[in-house]
Amino acid sequence: MARTQAEPPASQPDARAAWLRDQLERANYAYYVLDQPDLPDAEYDRLFGELQQLEADHPELVTPDSPTQRVGGAVASGFTPVVHDAPMLSLNNGFSDDDIVAFDKRVADALDKPTDLAGSVTDPVEYACELKFDGLAISLRYERGVFVQASTRGDGTTGEDVTENVRTIRSIPLKLKGAHVPALLDVRGEVLMFKRDFARLNERQRAAEQREFANPRNAAAGSLRQLDPKITAQRPLSFFSYGIGVLDGMPMPDTHSALLDWYEALGLPVNRERAVVRGAQGLLEFFRKVGERRESLPYDIDGVVYKVNRRDEQDRLGFVSRAPRFALAHKFPAQEALTKLVAIDVQVGRTGAITPVARLEPVFVGGATVTNATLHNEDEVRRKDIRIGDTVIVRRAGDVIPEVVGALLERRPVDAAEFVMPTECPVCGSKIERLPDEAIARCTGGLFCPAQRKQALWHFAQRRALDIDGLGEKIIDQLVELNLVRTPADLFNLGFATLAELDRFAEKSAQNLLDSLEKAKHTTLARFIYGLGIRHVGESTAKDLAKHFGSLDPIMDASIEELLEVNDVGPIVAESIHQFFAEEHNRTVIDQLRAPGKVTWPEGPPAPKAPQGVLAGKTVVLTGTLPTLTRDAAKEMLEAAGAKVAGSVSKKTDYVVAGAEAGSKLAKAEELGIPVLDEDGLHQLLEGNTQ
């Protein structure tokens, strides 16, 4: 790589520092991205040392994008949450050729691709194909070309700030190349560790008599989440860009492949193992070629990713739940091994799900030693005919979650014992129930069971339930682990002294939480019902129950037949409600919550059988941001007037209320000829003016 820029003299420290930064970043790019080093190590070290000394003599010359800032900052006490500007969505998975053909057909149908008389698509969809790296997804934020923040994926909405650690990854530019860079760019990609670097790291670990890492993914994830950036700086991490979150100040590239080409021009690392293909056959051919080369690749992958290439077609396809409709991860077959099943226990999940777990003789599979594996549910154990004492096939599904695939019947010992599902929860002793047409058995002691305690408390405190501000997951973890809170009722017994002693919980925070708990004592019946966390009872069903019965006792004592009379309550929901209130442990907690000085709400008469209100029977959709009303406030006003508030626009929609930045729902309403109202129109509608 040519270095034609004139070298400023030492007498010009400002220009000299800028020149040194440029030389070092060019060398980093050639070495870590292009894999074509053009500067001897000794010369790199000399230039780096000169820049360090220059910045020490002139601290005002230190810039955030200086290569010297990669060595690691101060030790952090924890990671700060970061709310992503655009969600970091997961991908739906495909495993077989049939899955890929079905995916292509869904996409082609949704895009109205033309077909011939035989039903074959005559203009196949164009896809961008990439590798699916086995690492850790992160988001990089650049402002006017300068790297300012990095965050992990987290739950897709909120991640953790790992800026100082990511700053140490040499392949990530601290400043984008080129004179024309966007005002804001949110780059999505994967932090990973190459196989050779992983081997060298473990050699160092052995030499230092420290624990070795099981696989490159664990090493990468552990390195990125070090509290001390200096440790991360010593770990050989790499990065590949593959997506985008937010772009401001420049037009979005027309295709995904063009986006990746643009990233390369900006100096961002982009993997070269990619292609643009057409139709299902093109996808499968790419998958097979990559599969043949998988073991020879310098890094671990667990599949490939397909994305509809054209941006306008991606926008048309949109998203479903937490995944895009225009993309799919095609996973490789998982790795398998044989071992002996020595016992079957059951574990209770945070939502009460009872899962049989296989206890295994240790076996190394998929890069890790496995001693436990999921059996999913009772039906799966029966279907696979798995017994205690069997020699079983263990697979790391998706190379992460171990599962028992089946038993080798020819090796079955004569004393192999069948699994028997317990009838009582092994944690709390409550009855285990399994609803009709459901595969999962569940503990019915939702408010009482210690295994479900944290989930029950979090749900009870959330905004749409009791709305206990300040009671986050970390505080709940402490309260439960210190045995200060066993049920939601215990929350209202907490005192200032107890809260003030919690880790990282100042006196002001303690008082704020006490104030929030006091406020939460005055709620509504619907919020209280929703806060109980009854399976299948969401916010809407809780409102229907409160409206139908008027008070809590009739709900607790209602028969399944009486529950079925409630709007939108079917047999499964009715059975779930009935089972919840039939469990004495739950009733005990509810009585504690209703004790004097605890939670209260206005009682009301049962609702009339027919819906009342000026908007009875009408369906309304809200979209965008209204000038003065929050989405929740508008929804409550509409429901109070008898309307049903839906989440999507269809031919059954009567009105759409649109505010600022209304998106596809507004366009769909205009396409279908559905009346569109602003906030003033909403108020007129609520007053009975439906014209």
UniProtKB/Swiss-Prot annotation:
GO biological process: DNA repair; DNA replication
Enzyme class: ligase
Pfam families tied to this protein: BRCT, DNA_ligase_aden, DNA_ligase_OB, DNA_ligase_ZBD, HHH_2, HHH_5, Nlig-Ia
Residues where NAD(+) binds: 41-45, 90-91, 130, 153, 190, 307, 331
Keyword Manganese: yes
Cofactor: Mg(2+); Mn(2+)
Positions bound to Zn(2+): 425, 428, 443, 449
Record keyword Thylakoid present: no
GO annotations of cellular component type: cytosol
EC number: 6.5.1.2
Reactions it catalyzes: NAD(+) + (deoxyribonucleotide)n-3'-hydroxyl + 5'-phospho-(deoxyribonucleotide)m = (deoxyribonucleotide)n+m + AMP + beta-nicotinamide D-nucleotide
Superkingdom of origin: Bacteria
Active site residues according to the UniProt entry: 132
GO MF: DNA binding; DNA ligase (NAD+) activity; metal ion binding
Keywords linked to the UniProt accession: DNA damage, DNA repair, DNA replication, Ligase, Magnesium, Manganese, Metal-binding, NAD, Zinc
Alphabetical list of InterPro entries matching this protein: BRCT_dom, BRCT_dom_sf, DisA/LigA_HHH, DNA_ligase, DNA_ligase_AS, DNA_ligase_CS, DNAligase_adenylation, DNAligase_N
Domain BRCT: 610-691
Family, per entry: Belongs to the NAD-dependent DNA ligase family. LigA subfamily.
Function of the protein: DNA ligase that catalyzes the formation of phosphodiester linkages between 5'-phosphoryl and 3'-hydroxyl groups in double-stranded DNA using NAD as a coenzyme and as the energy source for the reaction. It is essential for DNA replication and repair of damaged DNA.
PANTHER family registered for this protein in UniProt: CHROMOSOME TRANSMISSION FIDELITY FACTOR 18, DNA LIGASE
Protein's name in the database: DNA ligase
